[in-house]
Amino acid sequence: MLRLPRITRRALSSGALAPHFDRPLPPPPPAPPAPLCALPPLTAPDALAPLTRRTVRHADALVARIAAAPAHPDPAELRRVVKNLDRLSDVLCGVIDMCELVRNVHPDPRWVAAAEKTYETLCSFMNQLNTSTGLYDALVATVSHTFPGNPLSPAELRVAQTFLSDFERSGIQLPPGVRAKFVRHSDNILSLGRTFLSFAAAGPSADTPIEIPEPEVLLAGLSSKFVASLPRKKRKGPALLAPGSWEAQMIGRYADNEEARRLVYIGSMREDKDRVYVLETMLKERAELAHVLGKETWADVALSDKMAKTPQNVLQFLTSLATHHRPSAAADVAALQRLKALSTVSRTSSQLPTVHAWDRDHYAEQYAASLLPNGSLPSITPYFSVGTAMSGLSHMLSRLYGISFKPVSVAHGEVWHPSVRRLDVMDEHGKRIGVIYCDLFSRPGKPSAGAAHYTVRCSRRVDDDPSEGDGLPPGWDQHLGKGMEVQGEALHGKEGKYQLPIVVLTTDFGTVEESGPALLGWNDLETLFHEMGHAIHSMIGQTEFHNVSGTRCATDFVELPSILMEHFISSPAVLSTFATHYTTNEPLPIPLIQAHLQLDQSLKALETHSQILMALLDQKYHSIKHGEQLDSTRVWNELQSQVGVIPPVRGTAWQTQFGHLYGYGATYYSYLFDRAIAGKIWSSLFARGRTGPAAANHDPAAAEDILSREGGEAFKEKVLKWGGGRDPWEMVGDVIGGAEGEQVAKGDEKAMELVGRWMIK
């Protein structure tokens, strides 16, 4: 068993890390601008156009080389096909992924416009490559060849199978005219998806304000100052609210009058026919694309290479969860009904009143207050400055995986806003293994799409690139500028040199001022640990191949490391190792931690049931067939009536705000699926039966066991380091071990049922 010294607060001194996040940083010294993210081509917005041309030129050369490999007189050229396909993927994704970041976070519209253009051009180009028979035939020839004395490695075979699946999902075996349909439908889906996401990120349309008549009456219970601050059409007229605004949210949560809450809810969720049209057209385009590929539904297409494999398996998983959780969710609703009954003075019926969608937040707030001795709890935010949380994260990761964060000053021009911080991720040997840019703080005009993890560059081995055979003449890129290529760096325990991963985390955590740091609430803390789980997967999952590096794995596996991180932050023993008051340095009182954790669990069944409903909705939308009509609002309302515990609301269309319908099309169940697996791994590797007093207080032994290197190394070696380079079912089975591990490693229907039982437990 690997053991580290006993955890002490002194050992967890924050050093330079906390000030890096808790104090305003001085501007970098005047100097010629550095390229964005220290990537040489990214010197200015107008550098993206020549970079795009350079990328296409290089990609064309690689395509020609790969397609010619089967006829090449040297068998070694065929042996290089998997490597060259991975290089081709890296050449394109290195620019596409960077543009995805820039178009979402950069405040300069010139950068955004240039990134949008490059993104569209290269995504369309990639869609065409996915139907290239030359590439596909070369890959088939490669995997069919035995290569005596030098067979394809398991990693190469995994990468090859990933590419083959991508080609076949793109209809590579279809006639040329049908393949052209694939490209057209894919481009349409890309365009519609971007529009849908922009609508979802923008929130409800503000074209028609919400009107609250007689606000002095309907808004009783809210402060007179708040009511007086609301704009009106005319003096003594109705108050006007922007749908989805913070004022609307305040009324939905705190207004005692049900009619006021109803008006705000319907106004914020009202059906927008243009947005509904975009969503339904996108879903129909996906159904058409599935038909082109010879599949019944888009869910069949999307799940073919996922752990769940089929829509039937997903529906079985979700239906069993819904059946199990519905009574508990109904019990949560009954608790809210009782509170509503107490506040409904004119009630004459003995039946409990219905809790509507506009009641949920209001009575949930009252329910939470009813659990507290004096109706409230002291805030925990002073104990969690961003710097304190980052220091705790770094020390936790050091104990588990032997990696830590090193704060680094950025050069002028390296980041898109002065509030962005850079961390170098270091191994135990003092070697940098990657870079994380942290765009964590609020700023005017910052997109409010929530927290996100962007992979700007994946890791891969680069010293063995056979670039001399690409067929590009000397000086071919002289007029196009620099590319994304790197020389690579040596990593401890790995042969060769690797390009290091670069990731970006974005959140909206308030601002850092001279007067004090940004402080995190409980949800913020969970968000930070969750997103850092993705980043650490990228840092540790450094494989030889770009296409299976880090988070490039099955969608229903990728959330596992992040959800596991949430378990650590929910452990009082772990929190007690770093949570200190930002002014007094006093430790967070354990009873206060426990009270907040208990509060966080209130109405949890209702929240879980809501997630199940959303996952079922995602499946239903992506189970429509070619030519089938779709009324997305009717489908959502019927699902709420049949499976939900709160009735639907006429005239609303919440589904247009469900942005994950694009990015997670038919795979939104992944959050629940990975939550089941993460819970099992947590109890098997880290909690190890610690459910008694030692786990619930600051007993150092509890923290030492939870943060044991033994558990961390097991998860690192059996899961994280592989990225997507190994069958995820085998990884889960390996880390669980025993009879259950053997069963789940098979990845069949019984394995799916077993994961479902883990969730129900």
From Swiss-Prot:
Cofactor: Zn(2+)
Keyword annotations of the record: Hydrolase, Metal-binding, Metalloprotease, Mitochondrion, Protease, Transit peptide, Zinc
Superkingdom field: Eukaryota
Entry GO CC: mitochondrial matrix; mitochondrion
InterPro entries: M3A_MIP, MetalloPept_cat_dom_sf, Neurolysin/TOP_dom2, Pept_M3A_M3B, Pept_M3A_M3B_dom
Catalytic reactions on record: Release of an N-terminal octapeptide as second stage of processing of some proteins imported into the mitochondrion
CDD domains with a match to the protein in the record: M3A_MIP
Note accompanying the cofactor annotation: Binds 1 zinc ion.
Catalytic site: E531
EC number(s) recorded for this UniProt protein: 3.4.24.59
GO molecular function: metal ion binding; metalloendopeptidase activity
Record's subcellular location: Mitochondrion matrix
Binding site for Zn(2+): H530, H534, H537
Any GO BP: peptide metabolic process
Signal peptide (UniProt feature, chain positions): none
Protein family: Belongs to the peptidase M3 family.
Described purpose of this protein according to its UniProt entry: Cleaves proteins, imported into the mitochondrion, to their mature size. While most mitochondrial precursor proteins are processed to the mature form in one step by mitochondrial processing peptidase (MPP), the sequential cleavage by MIP of an octapeptide after initial processing by MPP is a required step for a subgroup of nuclear-encoded precursor proteins destined for the matrix or the inner membrane.
Protein name stated in the entry: Mitochondrial intermediate peptidase 1
Species of the source: Cryptococcus neoformans var. neoformans serotype D (strain JEC21 / ATCC MYA-565) (Filobasidiella neoformans)
